[in-house]
């Protein structure tokens, strides 16, 4: 999910100087019991010793013939419908990419105290790794089967979200079920100049075209541990430099991130990488600009933007001197554009989230009161979109929803767009700043 830069920072003059491709195969190791029977026939005409030897020989032969039957290895279905805990019955979910700390923090890798602190976070890591593996399996299915020219955005979004719900084992139709595990951020399908926060509302008929550049941004959570990750799809190779620039910029941000690293240093490195690329369309070259008012961000439990003490990770130089700290979780995301490199609110809103720790506000509309109660019980502070309300059987809720927004109880996140005619791209990963190593929890073979 994109975090916006404060307006005063966005206005800075920046022109002077940017696991696993397939579902893991798991053998359950189950074995069938030997069914061999001891059938040694006695021969009255033979002596006892000879008969015994013959029986023993027959037993050995039968034992050799009786082989253990192997159960078929379990793999994820297509579409993904097998809960991840079935594929990983011992909850031994795959690690993300493990990166050792460098320079002044290199001691953390072998420091016994730091390793002990890390081992204390076992439940935290298990929940994050489960969410990350679900994200990998669903997104790789989406890339192969859902995201194609001619597909509707609604079909793509619902295909992704259905996969996430099945793999978590929580369909979210019962009160509170979505809070156990499920969608951590609604599926954003942002086309061309639209950079973030666009998801199809009910009745949307938009069809993906061959010449489109689409950002796919969604989150998965287990017990509020949100994995926020995004990628960009383009079918025309003319857009490859744009995708490469943004992917490399994100990887630069991940490489630079670490304990005690200043946000300003990360932003400068990201911008330098991204803006070393350009895109040529029909003989015209377009410099690729970092979108200066979009940022990465901390992630808190059940809070996509890390709560009141959340931090932002700029993608341009000139940011503040705030440092990253041990134990924090970050979404490192970058956006590149062939336009102005600045986004504004545009189009119909689909994304919303309850404001954490909002003050008590008297609500006069009964529709707003009822809707707020439903949001609390089903989403808490997790972001949601209008389709999720439709799915829960809500009708004619817009008046109440707008009242909650105007009352300061719910935040609306309109789509964020650069100028029309431009193209934008996004790549994003979630990283954990563990005491002894940095883990890129959402890393996969795809990006």
UniProtKB/Swiss-Prot annotation:
Specify whether Transcription regulation is a keyword of the entry: no
Q: Which GO terms describe its biological process?
A: proteolysis
Which residues fall in a compositionally biased region of kind Acidic residues? 34-47
> Where do Polar residues bias regions lie?
15-30
Q: Gene3D superfamilies attached here?
A: Creatinase/methionine aminopeptidase superfamily (3.90.230.10), Winged helix-like DNA-binding domain superfamily/Winged helix DNA-binding domain (1.10.10.10)
Where's it found, cell-wise? Cytoplasm
Cofactor comment in the record? Binds 2 divalent metal cations per subunit. Has a high-affinity and a low affinity metal-binding site. The true nature of the physiological cofactor is under debate. The enzyme is active with cobalt, zinc, manganese or divalent iron ions. Most likely, methionine aminopeptidases function as mononuclear Fe(2+)-metalloproteases under physiological conditions, and the catalytically relevant metal-binding site has been assigned to the histidine-containing high-affinity site.
Which cofactors does it use? Co(2+); Zn(2+); Mn(2+); Fe(2+)
Binding of a divalent metal cation 2 occurs at: 228, 297, 333, 428
Any one GO molecular-function label of the UniProt entry: initiator methionyl aminopeptidase activity
**Bias (Basic residues) ranges:** 59-73
Keywords for the protein's UniProt record, in alphabetical order: Aminopeptidase, Cytoplasm, Hydrolase, Metal-binding, Protease
Q: Which residues bind a divalent metal cation 1?
A: 217, 228, 428
Task: Identify the EC number(s).
Answer: 3.4.11.18
Give the binding site residues for substrate.
197, 305
GO CC annotation terms, alphabetical: cytoplasm
Supply the Pfam families for this chain: Peptidase_M24
Its recorded reaction(s) are:
Release of N-terminal amino acids, preferentially methionine, from peptides and arylamides
Region annotated Disordered, chain positions: 1-89
State the protein's purpose. Cotranslationally removes the N-terminal methionine from nascent proteins. The N-terminal methionine is often cleaved when the second residue in the primary sequence is small and uncharged (Met-Ala-, Cys, Gly, Pro, Ser, Thr, or Val).
What protein family does this chain belong to?
Belongs to the peptidase M24A family. Methionine aminopeptidase eukaryotic type 2 subfamily.
HAMAP family, from UniProt? MetAP_2_euk (MF_03175)
Q: What is this protein called?
A: Methionine aminopeptidase 2-2
Q: Which species is this UniProt entry from?
A: Arthroderma otae (strain ATCC MYA-4605 / CBS 113480)
